[in-house]
Amino acid sequence: MMKVLVVAALLVTLISYSSSEGIDDLEADELLSLMANEQTRAKACTPRYYDCSHDRHSCCRSSMFKDVCTCFYPEGGDNKEVCTCQQPKHLKYMEKATDKIKNLFG
């Protein structure tokens, strides 16, 4: 009996919400014009093997996974840290495997 009351209350709530005037007063034309005028806020991503020390979360995506900013100290005595966008090996192998599977069945 309790389940029936809960379901009935849920249905009444959904019906009253859907029949109300709506929360948003924007018309479809206004919404489309706002979407057309909105500029992209995403900054440009850093390509693979380029320096990402300025922003370690800016690496581009490959076909499936996002590259990772990897930092290391190069050989040669310079103690300056170098950071580049790279694809981890396990993700590289996963992409190759999925590409081969897609080529077999697709």
From Swiss-Prot:
One Gene Ontology cellular component annotation held by this UniProt entry: extracellular region
Location of the protein in the cell: Secreted
Protein's UniProt keywords contain RNA-binding: no
Keyword field contains Transmembrane: no
Signal peptide, first to last residue: 1-20
Disulfide bonds: C45-C60, C52-C69, C59-C85, C71-C83
Entry keywords, A to Z: Disulfide bond, Knottin, Secreted, Signal, Toxin
Tissue expression notes: Expressed by the venom gland.
GO molecular function, one term: toxin activity
PROSITE patterns: SPIDER_CSTX
Transmembrane domains' residue ranges: none
Coiled-coil stretches noted in the UniProt entry, renumbered to this chain: none
Propeptide, residue positions: 21-41
Main subcellular localisation: secreted
Domain remark text: The presence of a 'disulfide through disulfide knot' structurally defines this protein as a knottin.
Similarity section: Belongs to the neurotoxin 19 (CSTX) family. 02 (D7) subfamily.
Name of the protein in question: Toxin-like structure LSTX-D6
Species of origin: Lycosa singoriensis (Wolf spider)
